[in-house]
Amino acid sequence: RRLSTRYKVDLWFHQYNEALFNAILRDSIGRYNKYVVMNFDNEKISPYLYKIDSSRLLLLDFGQFDKREYSYICQDFGEAFYAAMAQLSDRLQNYRKLILFLARESKHPKETCDYFRKYCVDHQLECEIIETLDDREVHSGEAYIAIRQVDVVEIVKKSRAAGLTCGVDFGLIAYNDTPAYEVIDKGITVMSVDWQKMGILTADFILSGKPIQVCLPTEVNLRGSL
């Protein structure tokens, strides 16, 4: 919204495919005044990024790699995730078990799993990490953390089939806020960065060219599901 209609913007999707990502970058070098790039991986950087003038490049979201010479607006999938869970400690203590659902095919950084386990050990909570909901039922007394929206919906569907009430019989936390989470049941508790702020800062970089290096905090939106 902060960019006028005078700006020409090309939007490319790499679907987290490294070969496609590299091909897009290779064909884009020298064609644009600014490059706003979400990397294909959180820990591995493409050599083609080094071919872009660092003053023209902004890295978004993923960033667990050496990016000292680049502008970036990233999120922390480890310590910030732990800190967000700590904000919910009073609620999480009401559950006998915490379950993180992270699908095998998900591109979400796996360091979240490490900090999930660390939080549960530090707070003496039973925990489990699962990759599929196919043969899994939702049980009373458990709290679930789901990364993808499709998995949040599946957990809600399974709970309704079992006659369980979200926020009463079991807990549910989603990752990355969407408008839908405000209206599902009595609202889904969310851990998320401020995407609007990320967009505003990105527009500022495009407009001013002023270098920026910031890691946005993971915020908690507490709703009726926990």
Predicted regions: what they are:
Residues 1-83, 143, 150:
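Alpha-helical recognition/docking segments in bacterial nutrient-uptake
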Residues 2, 27, 87-91, 118-119, ...:
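A generic secondary-structure signal
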Residues 3-15, 98-101, 113-137, 142-143:
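Short beta-strand elements in bilobed, periplasmic/extracellular small-molecule ligand-binding domains
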Residues 25, 46-52, 111-121, 155-159:
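Short, aromatic/basic amphipathic alpha-helical patches
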Residues 37-39, 59-61, 74, 99-104, ...:
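Short beta-strand/turn micro-motifs composed of small residues
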Residues 63-99, 152, 191-211:
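Hydrophobic alpha-helical segments within soluble ligand-binding/sensing domains
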Residues 82-123, 214-226:
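An alpha-beta-alpha
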Residues 91, 139-143, 150-226:
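Flexible loop/turn connectors
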